[in-house]
Structures are given as structure tokens and as C-alpha cells.
């Protein structure tokens, strides 16, 4: 089993390489339907399984289409990782959509709505001392 520093280094290397593949190598038109970025790679301790989290900007239709394209390219990505990264065995790759940015945006929107409902002259909500 690899130590945590090695897992972290290999994860960041996989993230960089997959990002490059998304930009230049994966030719599936479905992947280009939405703007895709790799947000995180969760690598198992034995370096055999990689969960790749992606953020997709676009319509719901484009997101679904992009995820289908990514799922179909998992074998290609694994093969490319085996060639680009020196590991005994290339990890099994799975893509997952990361909804963190959407949730964060929704939370900011809700906080802004709450701020707008508080009257400006109300001193009870003033956080300055």
C-alpha cells in the first residue's frame, strides 16, 4: 500500500494529465458539449482506483451528454495514463460529476437574498463592535 504523500502526488499527476487529455486528446464530440474541468481526483491507497471529479458548465442536456462521453472514454483515459505515468498498473478510472461549485453558487445566492431582507438601519444585526 502506498503512503499518503505518494497517493497525493499521483492524484495531482493524474489530475494534470486528465486535464490535458480533456483539452487536447479526447476527440469525442460529447465531451465538448459542456465546458469541463477536473476538480479533484480521489485515488485509493493501493493506487488501483481513481475517481475523477469533473465540473461541467453548460445546460443540463450538455452535462448529461458530456458525462456520457466521459464514461465512454474511461478505457482510453486509463490506457493513456498507463503510457504517461510510470506505475506498475494504471488505476481503473471512473468519472463523477462534481456539484460542489453549483451548491456553493446556490448558497451564495441564498445568503445574498437574506442580506437583502435585513433592513440597513437595524443595529441588532450589526456585527461591528
Curated annotation (Swiss-Prot):
| Pfam families in UniProt | RBFA
Keyword flag Cytoplasm = yes
Where does this protein reside within or beyond the cell?
A: Cytoplasm
Annotated signal peptide? none
GO annotation terms (biological process): maturation of SSU-rRNA
Would the keyword Cytoplasm turn up in this protein's UniProt record? yes
Which PROSITE patterns does UniProt cross-reference here? Answer: RBFA (PS01319)
Entry keyword set: Cytoplasm, Ribosome biogenesis
Q: Name one GO molecular function term.
A: ribosomal small subunit binding
Give a GO cellular-component term: cytosol
| Domain of life, source organism | Bacteria
What function is annotated for this protein? One of several proteins that assist in the late maturation steps of the functional core of the 30S ribosomal subunit. Associates with free 30S ribosomal subunits (but not with 30S subunits that are part of 70S ribosomes or polysomes). Required for efficient processing of 16S rRNA. May interact with the 5'-terminal helix region of 16S rRNA.
Q: Which family does it belong to?
A: Belongs to the RbfA family.
> What does the subunit section of this Swiss-Prot or TrEMBL entry state?
Monomer. Binds 30S ribosomal subunits, but not 50S ribosomal subunits or 70S ribosomes.
The name this protein carries in UniProt is Ribosome-binding factor A
